[in-house]
Amino acid sequence: MSTQDGFATRAIHDGQQPDPLTGAVIPPIHLSTTFAQDGVGVLPGGFEYSRSGNPTRAVLETCLASLEGVDSEGQALIGVRAMAFASGLAASDAVLRSLLAPGDHLVIPNDAYGGTFRLVDAVL
């Protein structure tokens, strides 16, 4: 799709190519947790385990990057990328590790999600 297409058109179509195996116009939802490998670290489809990435999330990331990656005049912005995660804790971990350095202080509420609290308390 072109960055000149409207927001709604890009939201519906960007990142979505017909499935090469079935011809399905809408990309299928991939529920698989693991993907075949030709050898250790040799990933013919580019995916290994759904926790680190899968085709469904890749389509979502492409579409979101397209929607967020244009300026007010519809021109593409360079280096714009979207990231989708397998869980909320994975997203929290990525954001916190990208923003904080060892020794930084972070204030979180005492009723924060337990996994996030343990991440902050024991890892960061």
Predicted regions and their residues:
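Glycine-centered flexibility sites
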Residues: 15, 23, 88, 103, ...
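Short, flexible coil/turn micro-motifs enriched in small/turn-prone residues
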Residues: 18, 83, 109-110
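Structural motif
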Residues: 28-29, 81-83, 104-105
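Conserved N-terminal alpha-helix of the aminotransferase class I/II PLP-enzyme fold
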Residues: 34-94, 115-122
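Active-site catalytic pocket residues across diverse enzymes, especially alpha/beta-hydrolases
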Residues: 99, 123-124
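N-terminal glycine-rich, Lys/His-bearing helix-loop that initiates the first secondary-structure elements
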Residues: 1-47, 54
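Conserved PLP-anchoring active-site segment centered on the Schiff-base-forming lysine
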Residues: 98-116
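Solvent-exposed alpha-helices and their adjacent loops that cap or buttress functional pockets
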Residues: 21-24, 75-77, 98-99
